[in-house]
Amino acid sequence: MKGELLCVLLLCGVAFTLPDQGIHRRFRRGARSYRATCRDEQTQTTYQQHQSWLRPMLRGNRVEYCRCNSGLAQCHSVPVRSCSEPRCFNGGTCQQALYFSDFVCQCPDGFVGKRCDIDTRATCFEGQGITYRGTWSTAENGAECINWNSSALSQKPYSARRPNAIKLGLGNHNYCRNPDRDVKPWCYVFKAGKYTTEFCSTPACPKGPTEDCYVGKGVTYRGTHSFTTSKASCLPWNSMILIGKTYTAWRANSQALGLGRHNYCRNPDGDAKPWCHVMKDRKLTWEYCDMSPCSTCGLRQYKQPQFRIKGGLFTDITSHPWQAAIFVKNKRSPGERFLCGGVLISSCWVLSAAHCFVERFPPHHLKVVLGRTYRVVPGEEEQTFEIEKYIVHKEFDDDTYDNDIALLQLRSDSSQCAQESSSVGTACLPDPDVQLPDWTECELSGYGKHEASSPFFSDRLKEAHVRLYPSSRCTSQHLFNKTITSNMLCAGDTRTGGNQDVHDACQGDSGGPLVCMIDKRMTLLGIISWGLGCGQKDVPGIYTKVTNYLNWIQDNMKQ
């Protein structure tokens, strides 16, 4: 008996001391759920485990039925028919599954969402932002907004579970909205251990004296412009001549579309731009209005950097949407290499540094990439362009780097090249007489090296914060007798501390932007040109002074 007892005890000891070979326990760290989710990029919607949905196929009059399974969308095609009632906004086409009641909207360009209710081109809000339906999702404190459909918001007064959620712009997304007619768009964020509201950092649209510009396609335009491209006067939307037309003041949703007892330009059907009905040669027709898009230069969805590195901070392209990456084909081997940075200043034009092009590359060997956070990893919203031509300043001095500026024209089959998005946007050009106080803090960005001795460029976009030096400190005697001209400006990190903490540009950042906040817009003051090493304490970087080249830029863009 004692022997048997001893054997049992020994076996128990082995059981308690041997490692668990068959069971691999996973311990949760933090409060994050392990329940998988799926995100449908076509509708910008997130689905939970085992949830199903419909989405349009790329070709044919069919749609796909999808189901979220362990984080993967499993889809197959199903037949559909036209919906019995309109359910899609902004000109979307509604299709309903043949054998069950779910529906799907095929959205026109620029709109996404279950009901085509999200405007991907809306980069700012008008008025209080009550009608804002864009994709901004960052609060003023830099926090990411919570999805309106989150179960954590089910007891909040405004969530995607309200009966009138669609009307208020709420849904299965985390984009800023203003459902309660507050002063500007807001959202819920997780702060100090609880869910609370925060105003969003969404920029307000510029207010011109007549508001004769429009944002995106002008779907939300509510100004008073009333003339077409042929200078014809618009007909009132309640004119008896329009009886029988699709878009009039008598539509059930006319107020939501901006139609009424007036003749102001509107875009009720999500066309390319605002339009109106006119009489031409005694015939009723329509024409686009004589209007231009509002300038959205210098606006961005800034996200607070999370990782500090030598020379600056890792950042996201949405914080610097004007940043361009320029690549050139290798001479003796297939592939391409990163060349320099650049700055998008209009849809088809990028500024850079002249010294990047001293080898006189053929234009067809160059490529510009916009919207990329990681230098060599394609981004979800990136845009790539070949180069039509590039212009290097005729008086560029390769020894002193005086007139270190170049202009690249992007190639496109239309008059528009870069499409504006949260990842792609233009930096503002400054007024010729702009004067900023000495030591104004500005930002630079690029994919350059972390330090001069590094053999590699940065894998990810970086940003650095520097201050504008006074002209009295931007001289040859302060920079080891290097030539400094009136076409250059100096900027550097003035904080105390060792060299490892100094923000600065470095090799590979050349051609990139030095931008400063002017009237709440990031404005291009300098182009990264040259420096003495990288990140040296009390040694500023040298930038091409953009205000000296405004006429040169405009003249070359007109050619």
Curated annotation (Swiss-Prot):
The gene is Plat. PANTHER family: TISSUE-TYPE PLASMINOGEN ACTIVATOR, TRYPSIN-RELATED. Residues 18-29, 30-32 form a propeptide. Residues 39-49 are annotated as: Important for binding to annexin A2. GO terms for cellular component: apical part of cell; cell surface; cytoplasm; extracellular space; glutamatergic synapse; neuronal dense core vesicle; perisynaptic space; postsynapse. Inhibited by SERPINA5. Inhibited by SERPINE1. Its EC number is 3.4.21.68. The keyword Repeat applies. This is Tissue-type plasminogen activator. Glycans are attached at N149, N481. The keyword Hydrolase applies. The record marks Y99 as: Important for binding to LRP1. The active site is at H355 (charge relay system), D404 (charge relay system), S510 (charge relay system).
